Amino acid sequence: MNATESVMPADTQTLSVLVENKPGVLTRVAALFARRGYNIASLAVGPTEHPEISRITVVVDVAQHPLEQITKQLNKLVNVLKIVQLEPRQTVQRELVLVKVSADNTTRTSVLEIVQMFRAKVVDAAADAVTIEATGTQDKLTALLSMLEPFGIREIVKSGEVAISRGGRALADKSLLG
């Protein structure tokens, strides 16, 4: 697989899982997916606006197994507070990519034009390479990497997808704080 091929399986679903911010919770959640034979295509975890609650955003390959089965099992875990299946059209989804690209005196201007076109930014520069930071949808980042590939991609690191529902409603409300 080259750098521009999509790594997300075609049949995926995004779950937003609110959990108690305690040691071992992520391990139990990930172990549940593994035991049930689900492939996690993307995983991002971080604190919410409430320090005692963390949000796990997980993109799951559902080609082989129905999503309903895993949500029922997740709900049985003690530290899981809430699970929401995020619908793509009602959700803002983003990933972060850092990519180190070869860029010497002869190619640097072309690389920087691509950076500008994608509203990305250069976060480090050396005589023979630049490191670029970009955020966006998976499709946008795949397109960026495709345009940078001819220059020579030296290294890529991507975050997991993070997602939030559109509109004014919040996933974590005060009722979850018990």
Task: Indicate where each model-derived feature is located.
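Long, contiguous binding/interaction regions
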Residues: 1-55, 59-178
